[in-house]
A protein has these predicted regions:
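Active-site-adjacent structural elements in folded domains
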Residues: 9-26, 72-88, 99-103, 116-139, ...
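Long, well-ordered core segments of solenoidal/helical folds
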Residues: 1, 56-76, 107-132, 158-177
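Non-catalytic C-terminal accessory modules of carbohydrate-active enzymes
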Residues: 160-256
């Protein structure tokens, strides 16, 4: 795992707390996720030696991750030796929990604590890297964390929190953009506002950008409840298991 210094390491791009994160946690989590996928691929292709190698490396990196990034007593995410001055201090932001929970990396002994910590980062007020205070149930994740936050919540029994995030209208949230007139997914949640127009940092600003739209995967898999069965590729067998909005605000979901 090598930091791409030419690009300055984009990390959880446009996450409002990205500067509080240990970017190496993101690299390591995705490396472990990739190893799991490679093990499955090698197994399907009948490459047993490769499958065993990936499986062994997966177990080793998972152990490393838990020892390096998860504090044993409270399950909080912590900085690694990649940032020596911060080593062992809390990260404790949404994305730092979302990836290891969505990828099922955290050991069983710490998992419930980590889930509790993720919920705390969502239900509390948070401060952006620029010092702006955001209300509870704000989407503080960037391009990486946003793709997985719904899965991390729903897979651990908290679809109600995922729905609450989805239905939030204050900044930062998906519907904030809609309230400002969005008919597409924007690169930034506040690319345009009624108050400031196109003010602010518009040097890099797409008005048709997928990344925050990754929530669509959660809507398909959990709100609609249509999920694939890995044992039967191509949806030869699939799972229908919609997650109900217990607050009753989303009364139906339609799709295929």
């Amino acid at each position: 795992l090598v930091q791409n210094r030419a690009w300055g390491d984009l990390g959880d791009w446009l996450g409002l707390e990205d500067e509080k994160n240990d970017k190496s946690l993101l690299w390591e989590a995705y490396f472990i996720y990739d190893l799991e996928l490679m093990n499955k691929i090698a197994t399907i292709l009948g490459k047993q030696m490769d499958a065993e190698r990936f499986s062994k490396l997966y177990a080793e990196r998972k152990t490393f991750f838990n020892k390096t990034y998860i504090r044993p007593n409270d399950g909080k995410t912590i900085f690694s030796s990649f940032l020596p001055k911060k080593r062992g201090t809390s990260i404790d932001i949404q994305t730092s929990y979302v990836l290891p929970l969505a990828f099922n990396i955290i050991n069983d002994e710490q998992k419930e604590k980590a889930i509790k910590n993720l919920l705390e980062t969502i239900t509390r007020e948070n401060t952006t890297d620029c010092g702006k205070l955001c209300p509870s149930y704000s989407l503080m994740t960037g391009f990486i964390g946003t793709a997985w936050i719904g899965k991390a919540l729903s897979d651990n029994g908290y679809s109600d929190i995922a729905y609450r995030l989805l239905q939030q209208t204050s900044y930062p949230s998906w519907l904030y953009s809609v309230e400002q007139g969005a008919t597409t997914i924007w690169e930034r949640l506040n690319s345009y506002t009624h108050l400031d127009g196109f003010g602010g940092n518009n040097r890099m600003n797409s008005f048709n950008h997928y990344s925050f739209g990754a929530v669509g995967s959660w809507m398909y898999n959990y709100s609609l409840g249509i999920q694939r069965d890995e044992a039967f590729p191509g949806f030869k067998h699939f799972i229908l298991k919609p997650a109900i909005d217990l607050a009753g605000k989303m009364k139906y979901a339609k799709g295929y």
